[in-house]
Each structure stands twice: as C-alpha cells, then as structure tokens.
C-alpha cells in the first residue's frame, strides 16, 4: 500500500513510451482535473543520453578534481609555489570498466523545467540526491533505483550550470590570521584606519530629542515626495508617501546627518532642507518599477531564492546586491503576506497524495512464445541448440530468459532478456559497455548458425536476415592529399583490412598541415574526373548501338556430350546452398547475364575465376554433411528444368560462400603471379584469363604394354 502511495516531493518513474527508458521526475503538485483525473506537476531530470555530446564532455571535465600542491616543503607559499593540476577522480580510476559504465547511468542533470503529466503514467519510486564527495561512488551502485546529480541543465539555452557554490581554497581566498596577543601586550595597529565611527553612544542628546528629530526627518521626506513628480505617480496618496518616508533609508540618513553635525539639531535640520529643496531618500522598493516587480515575482516563483539565476534570466540590468535588498524589503510588504496566505489556502485544497496501482498490462515490446520458432538453416536446425532459442540478449548475451523484449530498430531484430529490459527501462542503458565505451565480451558462439550468422527467431524465412544501411564516403581534396603525405601514419592498407579500428584524425590533420608547405614545392597531381553531360552520353549510345551477342558455336565435343546419358557425369555445385532459396554467390553479387540460365550453368561453382570443373561419378563428395545421391538427373546444356521462380527480395542478404579448392585450382593458383592474385582478390567479379604459356600441361599418355606379342584367345 505504501509503495503505491505517491506524495508531493517524491522522485518517481514516468513512462511516456513503451520502448524508451522511464522519465525521472520530482512531484511538485498533484492537481485534480475537471474530468476527475489526477495530473502531476513535476520537475524534469535529464539523463546523459538526453543531452548533447559537447555538454557531456563539459560535465566530465567538471567532474575532475583540481588538486593544488606545492613545489616542495619549505618552498615559497606565494602564488609561484602553487600549481594546479586537473586529475581524474582516483576512485574512478580504480573502478572496472563495467562499473564505470553503470555509474554513468546513475548520473542525472537537474532542470528548472516544469511539466504536467498524467499520474497514471507513474511506474514506481526512485531516489535522487545531490552528489556528495564524502560518499563512495560504489555506494550509488549498491542501492537500487538510486541516482545523483551535480549540474543543472537548461533545455532552452542548452547550457550546464553548477547547482551549488564552490568554496575557494588557497592563500588568495583565505584571510591571514595574526598571532594571538600576549597578556598585557598592546595592539600596534591604528584602529582609526581599520574602522569608521558612525554613531556616538555618549552624545549630549537624550532619547526624546532624538525621536523628535526623526519625526521631523519623516515629515521632510513626505514633503519631498509631494514635490517629486515620479514619486507622486508611484505613491498617489498621502498615506503611501508617509509610509515610504518612514522606512529605514530615511531614518538612517537622518541619524547620519545628526552625527556629522556633532549632534546639533538645528544644524542637522538645516542639512535636511538645503537651499535647493528637501532631501529625498529612496530605497530599492521605490527605485523598482511595477514591471520590474512583476518580473521579480515571476522569477521567484520559478527559481526560488536562487538570485544568481534570477539576475541572469530575468533582471540582468540589476545588480545582485540590489536584487537581494529588494527581496528582503518585499517580504515586509502587504503583497507578500497576501500571497503567502493565498498559497497556504491553495495548498490546503490540493491533493497531498495519490494512490496508483501497479501497472500490469503487457508491454507491446514483449515477444510472445508462439512467435518464436526453431531456426532452420539449409533444412536442418543448428546442432546443440534447443528449439525456440533465437538471438542472444544484446546486453548480457544470455540465451535463456522467461520473457524476451524487442529492442532497438525493428529491422535489426535485437532483443533483451527480462533482467536487462528492466535495467534498460530504469537506467537508460545496457548493463555491459559496448565496444565504443570499453571492452565487451563477444557473443555466444553456441547461438550461431553453421555459416556464422546469428539465427533469428522469425516465423517466415524471408525475414530471417536483414541488410545493413549503406553509406557513402565523400572525401575532400585535403583528405586525399593527407593519404599521400601521411601514408606512414595513416597506413591505408592496414586501415582497409581493419575498418573497425579507430584512426587518430587529429594527429593526421596536424601532421598534414605541417607537411603541406614542403609538399607545395613538388605538388601532387590529382586525377581530374571529367564527367560528360547526359546529352553527350545519349548521343553516343544512339550512334553506337550495341550489337547483339552471337550464340556460342558448339564444338563436336559439346555435341557428343549433349547426347551422353544423364547419369554419366553428374554436375556438383560445391558451394553450400543458402537459406534464401538456395541461390548461388553470383546471383547475390550482380553478375551480368540471365539469372535463370546462370542458375543452370554447370560451371557456376567456379565462374568467378573462369574455370569449369567436371567431376566424375567415382568421387563421392559430401553435400551439407551428406553423401551426394547417385540417382541425380543431369542437366544438359540446353535444357531448362522446371525451377520454381522466386522473386529476389531487396531486404534479403546473401549467405556466406564456402569455396573448396581442389588440386586443379591449386595448380592454377601457382601459375599466377602475386600481383595477379591480389588483383583477382580485389576484383572477384572479373574472370581470370590464362595465357597459352600458362596452360596446364597435358597428361602423359598411358604407358605401352610390356609384352609386344599379340594376345591370342582360343575358342
């Protein structure tokens, strides 16, 4: 019962989206709407993921400690011997990367922004406290639903401010304490230079005479306000003018005038009414206009007694001293008393607490057990994997959970286990750090398919795999120049083989800037790409039509082979079939030609390197771990078997390719030079043309029989 009772001042979780993390808010008010619903007026807290990366870097810089140390014992205590150094919190250094990652999820940023949310969206309580340097950082991780903050975030201005003042430590900020005087020792300092006397307690006047003089001073102040046009507008009545003349500013000036005239009342009255007219003394209450007073009340309602923020955002033309002085005078007015009574009456009529039952509705991101089917690859399930097991958890990489939740973009089909989903909703991140944040253990290899692709739990094999979003890298001229000038730093071949390794672009840019003056003496020749206009290309295609490709001339050997029975030489494709309709590698990589004919070509297994492989029936190969069936109908060169057409889906991804090298291909590989091998690897779509000198040697003829005598067979 108490856990579901929410009061003003509680820190709570709010859910605004079924897939996003909870919002963290502090309840300021509970209001009942006209239709009977309860709305909560809350203060917003922001996570690290909600603000920009530049402000995150600023917050991390603020978290460093400024350690002041001296050059050594006995050194000068002045500013020369004091050195400031920014170091990382030593406690953060000792924490492992996983705890550092989780500690960042506990950091929040306070804001002055208020918003109203339905109370039915509350999903639980949490605790938020100001960061305490005396507490251990691990203590925040040991407590459940516990957060801390140290900076204030302004979502409109996109700025960060410190929420508390800082105590300045050092000789420049601390007072020098003199030694204690001994018994009977006199102070050698001149006291007249250290203090100023403004009132003499033992003066010749009695209290009655002083009170009468103060009454005269009030009367002079009232008369001066009657003569002043601006004051007559602000205090239109005599009663208000007399009240303004009776404030402390008038009395302090009268007593100061009496002290300066050596407590001679007649001289003091003459000083109050000089030749030009009576003296008018105004305080902050009279100096401020009505519009400025309204701005101050609005700022006080939003920021409270944070006078620095009030000055910066509402009254920048006023000094901080003036604002503080006006505040304490404003508290003595009738308007302040009336507002205080009105707020107290409103607080009595408002709700103090509200009961919100537990939210038991199913989350739309839940993955139902009926939709999880056993993953089938090439007609067989993954060995050692239980039916229903799919992709592992993106956070902890577990494959066992009583409930799964879809997470991330829908096309990625990522999911989280129940424990990591609760952590994601509360803390706005994953338990384990990613490779961008630090070390992260690799995925569970038991959850991989035979081709190394994670098996997805989807009802239809058409959506078993999704392609990643493509990108286009547009390089500038300076980037292309830097590739040549800083080749030993950039190491382009190494970077191409390891695209996931980061490149220090700042160091390369600095080195390129330093080498540019020397390189200007021998300028680099960049290849200029001249693109012809579209009209010129169309005219060329009209004048040079492509001739039709002639049919290949069949040789006598091919004619004889077409008449061979089907069982004589079955053609085996050594590439493993894919789960996407058993399509070959060439179909996925866009080789020119008719797709239907290409699927039926007997040399499709090695078409990329221009070699046709024919295997006799004597060699029994394995296909997907099973022996190839002997009763296989051979596909003749010009025949087209009834193949079920399947349209290629643009979101389907090709399967991995397994290339099995034979003795013949190894011999061909030895005939190629290293440059030709590398060129073929960089351009796998181009066929390899072997020169006649590189042709394979013919097999020697069979040896002649040893016995030359004829063999006679008698009946």
Curated annotation (Swiss-Prot):
What range(s) does the ELM2 domain occupy? 165-276
| Region named Interaction with RBBP4 | 656-686
This protein's GO cellular component annotations are: cytoplasm; microtubule; nuclear envelope; nucleoplasm; nucleus; NuRD complex
Cross-link Glycyl lysine isopeptide (Lys-Gly) (interchain with G-Cter in SUMO2) per UniProt, renumbered positions: 549
In what residue span(s) does the SANT domain sit? 283-335
Q: Where is this region: Disordered?
A: 437-460, 542-590, 673-715
What happens biologically when this protein's gene is inactivated, per the record? Answer: Mice exhibit a disruption of the free-running period of circadian rhythms under constant light and normal entrainment of behavior to light-dark (LD) cycles.
CDD domains reported for this sequence: BAH_MTA, SANT_MTA3_like, ZnF_GATA
Give the protein name, as stated in the record: Metastasis-associated protein MTA1
Q: Name the species this protein comes from.
A: Mus musculus (Mouse)
Which gene name belongs to this protein? Mta1
């Amino acid at each position: 019962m108490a856990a579901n009772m929410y009061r003003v001042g509680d820190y709570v979780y709010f859910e605004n989206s079924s897939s996003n993390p909870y919002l963290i808010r502090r309840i300021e008010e509970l209001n009942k709407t006209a239709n009977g619903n309860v709305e909560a007026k809350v203060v917003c807290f922001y996570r690290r993921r909600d603000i920009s990366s530049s402000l995150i870097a600023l917050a991390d810089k603020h978290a460093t400690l400024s350690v002041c140390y001296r050059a050594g014992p006995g050194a000068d205590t002045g500013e020369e011997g004091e050195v400031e150094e920014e170091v990382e919190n030593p406690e953060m250094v000792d924490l492992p990367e996983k705890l550092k990652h989780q500690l960042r999820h506990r950091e929040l940023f306070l804001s002055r922004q208020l918003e109203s949310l339905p109370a039915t969206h509350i999903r639980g309580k949490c605790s938020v406290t100001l960061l305490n340097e005396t507490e251990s950082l691990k203590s925040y991780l040991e407590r459940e639903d516990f957060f801390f903050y140290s900076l204030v975030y302004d979502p409109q201005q996109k700025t960060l401010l410190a929420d508390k003042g800082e105590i300045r430590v050092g000789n420049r900020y601390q007072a020098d304490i003199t030694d204690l005087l001994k018994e009977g020792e006199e102070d050698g300092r001149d006291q007249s230079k250290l203090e100023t006397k403004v009132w003499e307690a033992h003066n010749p006047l009695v209290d009655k005479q002083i009170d009468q003089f103060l009454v005269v001073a009030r009367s002079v102040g009232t008369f001066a306000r009657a003569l002043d046009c601006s004051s007559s507008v602000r205090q239109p009545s005599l009663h208000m003018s007399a009240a303004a003349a009776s404030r402390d500013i008038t009395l302090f000036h009268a007593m100061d005038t009496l002290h300066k005239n050596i407590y001679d009342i007649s001289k003091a009255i003459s000083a109050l009414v000089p030749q030009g007219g009576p003296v008018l003394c105004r305080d902050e209450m009279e100096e401020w206009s009505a519009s400025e007073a309204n701005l101050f009340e609005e700022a006080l309602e939003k920021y409270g007694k944070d006078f620095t923020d009030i000055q910066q955002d509402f009254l920048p033309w006023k000094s901080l001293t003036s604002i503080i002085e006006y505040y304490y005078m404003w508290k003595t007015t009738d308007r302040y008393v009336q507002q205080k009574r009105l707020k107290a009456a409103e607080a009595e009529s408002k709700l103090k607490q509200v009961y919100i039952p537990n939210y038991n509705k199913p989350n739309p991101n839940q993955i139902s057990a009926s939709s999880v089917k056993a993953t089938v690859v090439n007609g067989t399930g993954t060995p050692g994997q239980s039916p229903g097991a799919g992709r592992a958890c993106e956070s902890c990489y577990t494959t066992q959970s009583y409930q799964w939740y879809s997470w991330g973009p829908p096309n990625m089909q990522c999911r989280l286990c129940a424990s990591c989903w609760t952590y994601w909703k509360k803390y706005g991140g994953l338990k384990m750090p990613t490779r961008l944040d630090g070390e992260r253990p690799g995925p569970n290899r038991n959850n991989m398919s035979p081709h190394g692709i994670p098996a997805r739990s989807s009802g239809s094999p058409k959506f078993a795999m999704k392609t990643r979003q493509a990108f286009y890298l547009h390089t500038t001229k300076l980037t292309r120049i830097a590739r040549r000038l800083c080749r030993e730093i950039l190491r382009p071949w190494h970077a191409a083989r390891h695209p996931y390794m980061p490149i220090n672009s700042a160091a390369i840019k600095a080195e390129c800037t330093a080498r540019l003056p020397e390189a200007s003496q021998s300028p680099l020749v960049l290849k200029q790409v001249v693109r012809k206009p579209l009209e010129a290309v169309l005219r060329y295609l009209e004048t040079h039509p492509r001739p039709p490709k002639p049919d290949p001339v069949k040789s006598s050997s091919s004619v004889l082979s077409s008449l061979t029975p089907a069982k004589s030489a079955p053609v085996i494709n050594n590439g493993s079939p894919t789960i996407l309709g058993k399509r070959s590698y060439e179909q996925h990589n866009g080789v020119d030609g008719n797709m239907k004919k290409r699927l039926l070509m007997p040399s499709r297994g090695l078409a990329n390197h221009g070699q046709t492989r024919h295997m006799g029936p004597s060699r029994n190969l394995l296909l997907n771990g099973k022996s190839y069936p002997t009763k296989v109908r051979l596909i003749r060169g010009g025949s087209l078997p009834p193949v079920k057409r399947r349209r290629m889906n643009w979101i389907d991804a090709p399967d991995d390719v397994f290339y099995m090298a034979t003795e013949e291909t190894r011999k061909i590989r030895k005939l190629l030079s290293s440059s030709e091998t590398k060129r073929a690897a960089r351009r796998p779509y181009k066929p390899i043309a072997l020169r006649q000198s590189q042709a394979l040697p013919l097999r020697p003829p069979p040896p002649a029989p040893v016995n030359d005598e004829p063999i006679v067979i008698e009946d």
